[in-house]
């Protein structure tokens, strides 16, 4: 922990205050004794003498967690934001890693937690009028595929689709992974944007997914041997594919008779029964995405766009029919693609 209370009630911040290690200190939340530590590996911090009576700090912090909290606090201060590190929120009975401008809670999550606990903490923030952003440490970084827990850290915007935030203590940067999609193998495909600690306004960086910007896109990685992959999944009785095969069989169809083009598009937006951080209805996005690629003539190529791309195409021509619809569709699609590709 980076904050401790002196016997006179004053709060000390180990990031910016001069601390006398001989003084007595208390945890601001549970008021139990803590000691000041300063070593070669861990940055200067406070630690409970005993955690058994504290319900707010359940385990000793890692060096990564301490360093990232300190880095964000310094960045927020440099950005002239009103910021508290380890802000105790009595009504919530929890501590926010950082509280920016009194309403934005930044949670640095370096270790795994249950989806139930994540939802409880997220809901608690929202019910009390706070906006919470979860920033992920190394153990929770998105790599080849999304876990169920990582899906509950996803956010959504029209400009960047599904996205999440990562913190890199070694590289000293905040990372935005966005336009996150999944292919038929269950692998994640996405773009990455990095922001060095301390450069620019912290809140401006965190608002990136909602700022006005040029639309971006990327070419999906497709499996040219998708039919062989599906056969293998059925041979090994993979539950997901066995379920789909059963559904098709009931309809008089069969996965084994499909061609590669039948599996187009191979890359789709992330799906889940629910999302912990997303509250808007995503049905229009899913429908527009599906309709766009269903209409595509080239089944050998899939370019992925942000949700606003599909929304703009369908916004004015979705209900039109016949030749007029086709002309408008082609003209609007070409114009949007030119804007994206900078042609």
What are these regions (language model features)?
Residues 72, 98-114, 125:
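Conserved catalytic cores of phosphodiester-cleaving nucleases, focusing on short active-site segments
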């Amino acid at each position: 922990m980076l904050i401790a209370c002196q016997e006179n009630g004053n709060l000390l911040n180990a990031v910016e205050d001069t601390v006398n290690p001989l003084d007595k200190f208390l945890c601001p939340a549970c008021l139990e004794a803590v000691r000041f530590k300063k070593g070669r590996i861990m940055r200067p911090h406070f630690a409970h003498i005993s955690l058994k009576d504290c319900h707010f700090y359940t385990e000793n912090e890692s060096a990564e967690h301490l360093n990232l909290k300190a880095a964000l606090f310094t960045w927020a201060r440099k950005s002239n934001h009103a910021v508290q590190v380890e802000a105790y929120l009595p009504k919530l009975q929890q501590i926010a890693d950082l509280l920016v401008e009194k309403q934005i809670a930044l949670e640095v999550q370096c270790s795994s937690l249950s989806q139930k606990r994540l939802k409880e903490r997220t809901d608690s923030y929202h019910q009390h009028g706070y906006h919470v952003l979860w920033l992920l440490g190394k153990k929770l970084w998105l790599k080849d595929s999304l876990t169920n827990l990582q899906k509950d850290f996803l956010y959504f915007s029209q400009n960047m689709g599904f996205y999440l935030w990562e913190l890199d203590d070694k590289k000293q940067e905040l990372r935005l992974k966005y336009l996150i999609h999944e292919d038929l193998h269950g692998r994640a495909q996405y773009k990455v944007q990095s922001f060095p600690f301390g450069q620019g306004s912290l809140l401006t960086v965190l608002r990136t997914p909602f700022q006005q910007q040029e639309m971006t896109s990327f070419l999906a990685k497709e499996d040219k041997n998708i039919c062989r992959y599906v056969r293998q999944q059925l041979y090994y009785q993979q539950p997901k594919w066995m379920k789909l095969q059963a559904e098709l069989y009931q309809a008089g169809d069969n996965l084994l008779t499909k061609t590669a083009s039948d599996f187009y598009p191979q890359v789709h937006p992330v799906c889940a029964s629910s999302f912990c951080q997303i509250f808007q209805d995503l049905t229009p996005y899913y429908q527009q995405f599906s309709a766009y690629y269903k209409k595509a003539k080239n089944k050998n190529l899939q370019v992925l766009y942000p949700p606003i791309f599909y929304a703009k195409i369908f916004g004015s021509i979705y209900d039109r029919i016949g030749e007029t619809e086709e002309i408008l569709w082609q003209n609007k699609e070409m114009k949007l693609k030119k804007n994206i590709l900078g042609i």
